[in-house]
Design a protein with these regions (language model features):
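N-terminal pre-domain and mature-chain start segments
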Residues: 1-179
C-alpha cells in the first residue's frame, strides 16, 4: 500500500495499491486515520495463499447492516450524491428461477432527494436520517449496485411507495455465501 496526498503533500489523502494503483482507502478527517474501501480489498489468512473477496453488493449489505445497528437508524443520505436510502428490511428470504433454495437478503429502498433538499435540510426535518461515511467513488459504486439490483427484479417489484427497490445479498458466515 502506498499513501499519497493530492494537495501540497501535507497529509495523506488516499491509499493506493502499489501493484495496480487502485484506491484502497482515503483519509477520514473525523478519525484522522485511513478508512479502507472494503469492496476493493481481498483477504487471505496466509501470505502465499489465494485471496478471497466478495462482490460489492455483499460488502454494501454488510456496511448497511453495521450502520443500522450502530447508529440506530434506517434512513441514510449520500453526502455528495442527491439520493437517500431506506433500509426497509435487514432479514429477507427469497428464491428465484436461478436458485430454488431460499437466499438471505436485505431490502433497500432508494430515491432521489426532492429538489432543493440538501443533507442538512433533510437531517433538520428528520432526526432519524444519518449520513453515509463513504468516499465519493464508493458512493457512486453503491448507487450503481442499487440500480443493478433493482434491474434484476420483476418490473412489478421495482418500486414501492415512490421508492426504487433493491434486494442486496447478505453473507451468511465468513466461510460461505449463499446469495
Amino acid at each position: 500500500m502506498q499513501c499519497r496526498s493530492l494537495e501540497n503533500n501535507d497529509s495523506i489523502y488516499q491509499a493506493h495499491c502499489k501493484d495496480c494503483d487502485t484506491i484502497l482507502g482515503y483519509r477520514d478527517p473525523q478519525t484522522e486515520g485511513i478508512r479502507l474501501q472494503k469492496p476493493y480489498l481481498a483477504l487471505s489468512s496466509q501470505r502465499d495463499s489465494t485471496t478471497r473477496s466478495h462482490d460489492a453488493a455483499h460488502w454494501f449489505s454488510c456496511y448497511l447492516n453495521q450502520a443500522t445497528e450502530t447508529q440506530g437508524v434506517r434512513k441514510f443520505v449520500f453526502p455528495t450524491l442527491p439520493h437517500e436510502i431506506w433500509v426497509f428490511s435487514t432479514n429477507l428470504a427469497y428464491s428465484s428461477l436461478e436458485c430454488s433454495e431460499p437466499k438471505q437478503a436485505m431490502k433497500v429502498l432508494f430515491k432521489a432527494r426532492e429538489e432543493g433538499q440538501d443533507v442538512e435540510t433533510l437531517r433538520a426535518g428528520n432526526l432519524l436520517i444519518e449520513t453515509l461515511t463513504l468516499s465519493p467513488s464508493l458512493e457512486e459504486l453503491f448507487y450503481q449496485v442499487l440500480q443493478q439490483e433493482n434491474a434484476k427484479l420483476p418490473e412489478s417489484l421495482q418500486s414501492l411507495m415512490g421508492w426504487q427497490v433493491a434486494v442486496l445479498p447478505v453473507l451468511y458466515s465468513s466461510g460461505s455465501t449463499k446469495a
